[in-house]
Every structure is written in structure tokens, then in C-alpha cells.
Amino acid sequence: MATSEHSDIGRRQAIRALASGAVAAVASASWVESLTALARQQAHAHAATAAIVAQNWSPSTLTAPQNDLVVALTELIIPETDTPGAKGTNVNRFIDHVLTDAQPEVRASFVRGLTWIDARSRALFKARDFLGASAEQQKTLLTRLSAEGNPDKEEAIGRDFFEAIKSMTIDGYYTSEIGLRKELGDNGQLFLPQFQGCDHHEHQ
């Protein structure tokens, strides 16, 4: 098997593992469940496509610094390999679109999670914020938040937030043409406005 084929399989397996973990923990908070359900609905209906690909795009809900943080977090979740990662497929735009359609209290919970990420970075690493932390420190924090059985009550908000953004990142990635065609092997039939679902494991 060629190296690129190994890479494709490994990437799909990694994203499946991320998805299964997100689904398993999605009931950790009601706002997480609400937001991830909305994200799946948006991804499967492709309602966000036109807004995401617009050349003059700007965030409708997130501030510019919040959007920058979402870009960084999602790229750490699905990084670029031989195919573009979350940043290259505009997952941040998908997330902003979903947040715009979400209930105000759900949006507020997500934004509170972003604020918590920056505050926790300052507390743990003496960094200005998450983006000011080193790559190693950033990965350390996200690893802590994704660890099963993490008993740290101070990180409960962060764990709920990370499960939400992880699930939304996966759905947003598969909303993109690259995610569908390169990762799922779509021949062009799935990337349609009427796409209603997906039979891959990560969307079960």
C-alpha cells in the first residue's frame, strides 16, 4: 500500500476516534448537547455552505480574537497533513454560522468556554492567552481536557467546551468539499444541498 494510502487511513481512523469520544461525552452538559445537535443538522443539510465560502466572509457571532482562537483550536483537533486541516477547510466559519443560529444561552456557554481556555492558559503556563502559549503547552491543555476520568472540578467548563468544539469541528470538516471528497471518498454525489446524512461510523 502506498504511503499516501496509509496516511488517508490513519487520518480517517483518528477522526473516527475523535468522533466516538465526542459522542460518548456529549451529554456532559445540556448546552453541549444542544449545540452539537444543531451542528450535525447544519452539516447534514449543508445550510451553511454559501455563508462559509463567501469571499468577503466575516464572523457574525464571534469577535475577531474569538475567531482566531477557534481557528487555532480546530486546527489542533484536525491538523493539516497531506490534505488541508480544519483551518484550510474553514471550520471556524462553520462554527460561527452554527453559533449564530443557536439559542442565546448556548452561544454564551460556548463563548464562556473560549474565555475559560484563555484564563486556564494564563493560570497554567503564565501565558498571555492560549495563542500566546507554546505549541507544546497548547497540546498539554487540550490533552488534559480530553482525558477520561479527569477529576479536576476547575476544568469542568473546559471539558464541556472541548467536547462541544471537537464535535463541531468534525461536523464542520465533513461539511467541506475536501472533507467529503478526500476523506470520505465522495465522487461528487454527496456534496449537494439536499444531502441528508452519512453512513460512516463517525456520524452514527
Region annotations inferred by a language model:
Residues S7-D8, Q13, A29-A72:
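C-terminal segment of N-terminal export signals and the immediately downstream linker at the start
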Residues A2-S4, V53-A54, N67-L76, N90-Q204:
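Mature-region segments of soluble proteins
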Residues P84, G88-T89:
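Zn2+-dependent metallopeptidase catalytic domains
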Residues A25:
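Structured mid-domain segments that build the active-site/substrate or prosthetic-cofactor binding neighborhood
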Residues T3-A22:
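N-terminal secretory signal peptides and thylakoid transit peptides that target proteins
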Residues G21, L38, R144-L145:
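Low-complexity, intrinsically disordered/propeptide-like segments
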